[in-house]
Amino acid sequence: MDATVIDELQQILPIEQLRSTHASNDYVERPPAPCKQALSSPSLIVQTHKSDWSLATMPTALPRSISQCHQLQPLPQHLSQSSISSSMSQSTTASDQRLLASITPSPSGQSIIRTQPGAGAHPKVDGALKGEAEQSVGHSSDHLFICEECGRCKCVPCTAVRPLPSCWMCNQRCLCSAESLLDYGTCLCCVKGLFYHCSTDDEDNCADEPCSCGPSSCFIRWAAMSLISLFLPCLCCYLPTRGCLHMCQQGYDSLRRPGCRCKRHTNTVCRKISSSSSPFPKAQEKSV
């Protein structure tokens, strides 16, 4: 058993001979360009030194020739393979620590930047000049045709009827408006559903307008509604509630519509563009 241990120990090369062998190995050495890059970055230096030490500590390296095997000196018998490997690992760890200590910069040498430089100050836009520019652009495109009698604009957006406000509810499934509240409050929705299922003509609009006075089966519709009102008395409140809704619509339109509301035909005046702040300035010149 002692003879086999001595033979194995004799096959292990010393570190000096491994370094000389590594220096003459063409397959392990790297080209000069990566070497320069490794010298410039500390992380690559640490990796290359660790690889060199790993190659130096490999116990499975074999001698290149028989002459190198004869040049090995016999080791004492009281040394074991575990003690040799432990001493080599300790020397490797100590050298790695010294290398890392030399590469790591001292905390006093460089200061850590914790705050980023602020962005450059942008020029502030004058609010008054911006408002005047937007106002001049708005006057140049809107309110060009002014009524000669009331002094209001006669364009289509200004003279359009303003409906009562409405909104969508339940993920845009239900329309909440004055018309829908009137239909559900007076049970007219039940009459519409009944006319829709009982109608045989697809083009018949009796389900959409059951209370209209049109010629499309007017007598039958009103007779059916009179019969249904016996079971649904709330249908009798539909016509007066409809009149109140129409009055509310007229009042809201008179307050919200900015355009001309003249009933009779009046002359149209082309307004001269000016920087006046009034929404409807007086006419400056007439159109030819």
UniProtKB/Swiss-Prot annotation:
One of its GO terms (cellular component) is cytoplasm. One of its GO terms (biological process) is negative regulation of ERK1 and ERK2 cascade. Expressed in the brain with expression the highest in Purkinje cell bodies and projections in the cerebellum (at protein level). Also expressed in central and peripheral nervous system ganglion cells, superior cervical ganglion and dorsal root ganglion (at protein level). Expressed in the retinal ganglion cell layer and the inner nuclear layer (at protein level). It comes from the Eukaryota. Inhibits neurite branching, arbor length and neurite complexity. Inhibits EGF-mediated p42/44 ERK signaling. Negatively regulates the MAPK cascade, resulting in a reduction of extracellular matrix protein accumulation. May function as an antagonist of fibroblast growth factor (FGF) pathways and may negatively modulate respiratory organogenesis. Belongs to the sprouty family. This is Protein sprouty homolog 3. It comes from Mus musculus (Mouse). The gene is Spry3.
